[in-house]
Amino acid sequence: MEVQRNFFIFAFLFVSFLLWQAWQSQMFLNKKTNEKIDPIFHFIDVKKNKKKIFIKNDVISLVVNMYGGDVEEASLLAYKDTLYSSRPFKLLETGSDFIYQAQSGLIGKDGPDSSINDSRPLYSANKNFFVLGPNEKELRVPIKWVSKNGVIYKKTFILKPNRYDVQIEYDVYNPSKESLNMNIFGQIKQTINLPKKRNVYSGNFALQTFRGAAYSSDDNKYEKYKFDMIANNKNLHIMTESGWIAMLQQYFAVAWIPDNLGKNTIYTSSLDHDTAVIGYKSPIINIPPNSRSIIKSKLWIGPEIQKEMKLVAPNLDLTVDYGWLWFLSQPLFKLLTILYSIIGNWGFSIILITFIMRGLTYPLTKAQYISMAKMRALQPKIQEIKEKFSKDKQRISQEMILLYKKEKINPLGGFLPIFIQMPIFLSLYYMLIGSVELRHAPFLLWIHDLSSQDPYYVLPVIMGLTMFFIQKISSTNHISDPLQKKIMNFMPVIFTAFFLWFPSGLVLYYIISNLVTIIQQKFILSNLEKNR
């Protein structure tokens, strides 16, 4: 009975945690504010449908608006929009009901991106389509604008094969007799409330992940910043020499990594309370008369592949959202990746990692069963104490403590494996919903995506049957309270219903873990019976 009760306590705690997490993520939706928006960034929100150019390497396809040179659309060619879609996943887009853009420019006293005149440079290019060839090591896409006083601005997008980072390079030539002062900025803008077509997991509390802004600075390696904070004008203003700014969602990220020109300013802003902005602004860059200056920054548009992000910028790989158990999820993911490199199937890798985890916790499991067996053996003595001192609860507690000390039993020993296994289980959950490598990863037969729910609910039903079997071999026949007995008998049905929406990979882990529990329980109890 103790095994069964502990098992359901574990499941209940996990589901309760997920429900709380889903509630927390929805708290900001109705919050509003009447505070004014910083006018410095008003011009960024002007919608100009000017000429566009198209840039493509083997993994990303970009659409750049020549009015300002912003990246208004980005498709990830190696990732499908949905499991059965032939369209690539569109990360950045500019539509009537949703905007997600990566913007950059030169602002300040002499910058062409003017907040005062509400205008931006209209660049030109020698063609509309730029594609990285099969044998080319680099694609350079220059766009050009010349100011009225003859200053030449050349903005170049640099793409490399099989890379999601894009180098943005400004080449500013100042032919005048006056110095020019300007700042480079890079920012990401996104509509806060998702349209229905993008909000695919809105009804699934088990697949909720962080969506919002994030940054890295001198003082913080990685810090999330919720959209509701930006919408309520609780804005950032951080001076830092290192770091980056980003917007995150499940599996994918867009990030600006500024060049180290001194103290950059990280900021956030809200446009009409429905659009969030996070960005950076460099210190003043001086361009002397009759000289040129090269100003660089880097843009990441792609999946959260940790080993690649780590090479692009320090701490950028931390954007993979493993929640508060990242210190467990990261080594688990590395182990899972090693297993996958050997087996070649993520599902079988999950099965194998389950055996490994349960093997490592076997000594605790064994200690749990031994502790429970001793507790059952003491039940007659415990009952005798309760009857003898029925009118003195304090005396009952004292006598029971003395009994536990005499028999060398820890009454809480049976709960220890729960507190060991629950973090492992939760970290695996975070890993499954946060690792892009598992997105659309097939297993066998009808399971084509281990990161999403079972479309036919077969795995949750099997999981429920294993819970029911654990309940039966633990036996509820000796429960005297009829209500408690009914509740315990109904628990497998309740948790089967909860697990209908869980990722298939997590349900698979739970099934295998339950089967291991059954085998271990039979083996340990059998040995205990023999040794009596």
From Swiss-Prot:
A GO cellular-component term linked to this record: plasma membrane
S-adenosyl-L-methionine found in the keyword field: no
Any GO BP: protein transport
Compartment(s): Cell membrane
Source organism superkingdom: Bacteria
Keywords: Cell membrane, Chaperone, Membrane, Protein transport, Transmembrane, Transmembrane helix, Transport
CDD domains per record: 5TM_YidC_Alb3, EcYidC-like_peri
Topology with respect to the bilayer: Multi-pass membrane protein
UniProt xrefs under InterPro entries: Membr_insert_YidC (IPR019998), Membr_insert_YidC_N (IPR028053), YidC/ALB3/OXA1/COX18 (IPR001708), YidC/Oxa/ALB_C (IPR028055), YidC_ALB_C (IPR047196), YidC_periplasmic_sf (IPR038221)
GO molecular function, one term: membrane insertase activity
Residues passing through the membrane, by range: 7-27, 336-356, 413-433, 450-470, 492-512
PANTHER family associated with the record: CYTOCHROME C OXIDASE ASSEMBLY PROTEIN COX18, MITOCHONDRIAL (PTHR12428:SF65), OXA1 (PTHR12428)
Family: Belongs to the OXA1/ALB3/YidC family. Type 1 subfamily.
Function comment: Required for the insertion and/or proper folding and/or complex formation of integral membrane proteins into the membrane. Involved in integration of membrane proteins that insert both dependently and independently of the Sec translocase complex, as well as at least some lipoproteins. Aids folding of multispanning membrane proteins.
Quaternary context: Interacts with the Sec translocase complex via SecD. Specifically interacts with transmembrane segments of nascent integral membrane proteins during membrane integration.
Name listed for the protein in its UniProt record: Membrane protein insertase YidC
Organism: Buchnera aphidicola subsp. Acyrthosiphon pisum (strain 5A)
Name of the gene this protein is made from: yidC
